[in-house]
Amino acid sequence: MIVISHVLGNVKTDPVWAEKLKAYELDYLTLEHGDMYKNSCRKMTEQGKDLGISLERNSLLADGDVLLCDDKHAYAIIVKLILRDVMIIDLTDLLNFSHEMMLKISFELGHALGNQHWKSIIHESQVFVPLSVSHKVMESVIQTHRFTGIHYRFEKGDSILSCLTPSEARLLFGGAEDLGAHVHVDHSHSHDFMGHSHEHEGHRHVHNHAGNSHDNEHDEHHSRR
């Protein structure tokens, strides 16, 4: 096992490293959003090198980080970060509204996001919400509320990483496998837990347990209290 205790540099942000490693054989350590905040972990590179990551507390690995550089053999190990997409909700137009309207819309937006149990952070005049369900479902939730003066778009997670503090990045991406993603829109909701999903509006259930699935149609109606 090769122990990695610090980052040497970054090929994405440092042109010196980018130029140096052009002629090197590059091996990649692929990390997903749940791994990037871990100070200590054991991972295999794409070429099968066994790495023991042991970084200082609050260190955060970034896409393009150089973990190992062997000049003798012209070989280097680079971090390849795969982050979930992020919905960016732009609140800039609210600054032109009255204080009362600004507070009202902000409160309603916070309630809508909280009702979905979606994590979010506010950065300047934007709210960042990591993708926990499909783009279509997240769009549906925002569109259902018909917020005035609010615009949204989706961006790749790594495109906003540089403007986040380590604690903010950890909140949005770290260890956040949303095993129980709830979506509540009007009188329908869906759950996705370990392959178990429900849809209520009609009324249909689809279950998938350990490779076994069954589809049940229900005629009965549910009332919500």
Curated annotation (Swiss-Prot):
What does the record list as GO biological process? protein folding
Keywords per UniProt: Chaperone, Cytoplasm, Nickel, Nickel insertion
Q: Which SMART domains match?
A: UreE_N (SM00988)
Q: Where is this region: Disordered?
A: 189-225
User: Per its UniProt record, what Pfam families does this chain match?
Assistant: UreE_N
MF (Gene Ontology): nickel cation binding; unfolded protein binding
Subcellular location, record wording: Cytoplasm
Cystine pairs annotated here are: none
Tell me the superkingdom of the source.
Bacteria
Where does this protein have compositionally biased stretches of type Basic and acidic residues? 189-202, 212-225
Gene Ontology CC entries for this record: cytoplasm
Q: Which family does it belong to?
A: Belongs to the UreE family.
Q: What does this protein do?
A: Involved in urease metallocenter assembly. Binds nickel. Probably functions as a nickel donor during metallocenter assembly.
Q: Which HAMAP family match?
A: UreE
Official protein name in the record: Urease accessory protein UreE
Q: Which gene encodes it?
A: ureE
